[in-house]
Curated annotation (Swiss-Prot):
A cellular component annotation (GO) from this entry: cytoplasm
Its job: Involved in protein export. Acts as a chaperone by maintaining the newly synthesized protein in an open conformation. Functions as a peptidyl-prolyl cis-trans isomerase.
Protein name per Swiss-Prot or TrEMBL: Trigger factor
Alphabetical GO biological process terms: 'de novo' cotranslational protein folding; cell division; chaperone-mediated protein folding; protein transport; protein unfolding
Organism, as annotated: Streptococcus agalactiae serotype V (strain ATCC BAA-611 / 2603 V/R)
Length: 427
């Protein structure tokens, strides 16, 4: 194979490469065997036309496109490897010449990975808005949340107050005309929960069972239903019942009801403190890691980030998100309908972070290369075992989904992140 590379601009160039007759001939044979199955020519049984007759009737050139599709991927990859290029986007392939009996000549317009000039990435000093300390108030708040989960609703006489639940019928209208989604029967609404649009719940404070209240509100300007956004509306609301929470006493019996592994309230609080400390330690470490990586990226210089890399990252993130939705039984159409958004909105959302994610990956990859990080066979096997355990899969299933190169890359990236974070200190 003959290959050459011509720089056209920063991170852009043209690869010129050839495909030899040794590669072309077997590809032509494969192409002929594929197309002859569908050939129905007088004088021959379907699929049994000799190659010589095919060449006379259609010309060998009729096989070139199919043959090229067979040999191109491998030939292109070989050219990239021979030139030592790190290509980051799909190439634009052009045929220069495909003459019978001669090597085929092609060009590939490519985008290459930008140069990363690393700055400081070790012994960084960072600030984080996180703490490992757990206060008594945080422990008490967790107990109180669990206590409220065990609360029972009982019907009460008198006026509804914040925190009470009202059972209501409501009919909404704009300019006297009812609108879709503005009607409900026997709906349980906790006042102060923020379930309804601003201003609605507050107007039911002080109401009593049996009353009908006109609730006047204005839909927010950014309301998901565009035909209602910014408009004044009236909800004729009938209160059937007012219910209040009856929370259990804060004692040892409550503790046992919450967690059957404890005997006293003090034991429950001690258990919650350990859980909160563990969660806070993880959150603190994550915050340090995020801040250290962000500083390492800021200290580095990336020579002209190709827009194709950002574009590919946006689509990768969108496809991953929509794939997760579909695994939960939510189609893209259903998601956009439920959220009142469009594919363009989702694209903009991911576009905002794509540039940062691409730069971060490039810098971490550059650190891994600078440190000479590689994955051992033992580390690869451990990664496979860990992933299999995490996702409840067989190890062979993981091997089938992830190539060895992907696993090696991920392990090297983790080592680079560890270099950044393990030496970082908090101001």
């Amino acid at each position: 194979m003959s290959t050459s590379f011509e720089n056209k601009a920063t991170n852009r160039g043209i690869i010129t490469f050839t495909i030899s007759q040794d590669e072309i001939k077997p590809a032509l044979d494969q192409a002929f065997n594929k197309v002859k199955k569908d050939l129905n020519v007088p004088g021959f049984r379907k699929g049994h036309m000799p190659r010589t007759v095919f060449n006379q009737k259609f010309g060998e050139e009729a096989l070139y496109e199919n043959a090229l599709n067979l040999v191109l991927p491998k030939a292109y990859e070989a050219a990239v490897a021979e030139l030592g290029l790190d290509v980051v986007a799909q190439p634009k392939i052009d045929v220069v010449s495909m003459e019978k009996g001669q090597d085929w000549k092609l060009t590939a317009e490519v985008v290459t990975k930008p140069e990363v000039k690393l700055g400081d990435y070790k012994d960084l000093s960072v600030e984080v808005d996180a703490s490992k300390e757990v206060s008594d108030e945080e422990v008490d708040a967790k107990v109180e949340r669990e206590r409220n989960n065990l609360a029972e609703l009982t019907v009460k006489d008198g006026e509804a107050a914040q925190g009470d639940t009202v059972v209501i019928d409501f009919v909404g209208s704009v300019d006297g005309v009812e609108f879709d989604g503005g009607k409900g029967d026997n709906f349980s609404l906790e006042l102060g929960s923020g379930q309804f649009i601003p201003g609605f719940e507050e107007q039911l404070v002080g109401s009593k069972a049996g009353q009908t209240v006109d609730v006047n509100v204005t839909f927010p300007e950014d309301y998901q239903a565009e035909d209602l956004a910014g408009k004044d509306a009236k909800f004729v609301t009938t209160i059937h019942e007012v219910k209040t929470k009856e929370v259990p006493a804060l004692d040892d019996e409550l503790a046992k009801d919450i967690d059957d592994e404890v005997e006293t309230l003090d034991e429950l609080k001690a258990k919650y403190r350990k859980e909160l400390e563990s969660a806070k330690e993880i959150a603190f470490d994550d915050a340090v890691e995020g801040a250290a990586i962000e500083l390492a990226v800021a200290n580095a210089e990336i020579v002209e980030l190709p827009e194709e890399m950002v574009h590919d990252e946006v689509h990768r993130a969108m496809n991953e998100f929509m794939g997760n939705m579909q695994r939960q039984g939510i189609s893209p159409e259903m998601y956009f309908q439920l959220t009142g958004t469009t594919e363009e909105d989702l694209h903009k959302q991911y576009q905002a972070d794509a540039d940062k994610r691409v730069k971060t990956n490039l810098v971490i990859e550059a650190i891994a290369a600078a440190e000479g990080f590689e994955a051992t066979d033992e580390e690869i096997e451990k990664e496979i075992t860990d992933l299999a355990s995490e996702y409840n899969m067989e190890a062979d299933q993981v091997r089938g989904l992830l190539s060895a190169d992907m696993l090696k890359h991920d392990i090297a990236m983790k080592k680079a992140v560890d270099v950044i974070t393990s030496s970082a200190t908090v101001k």
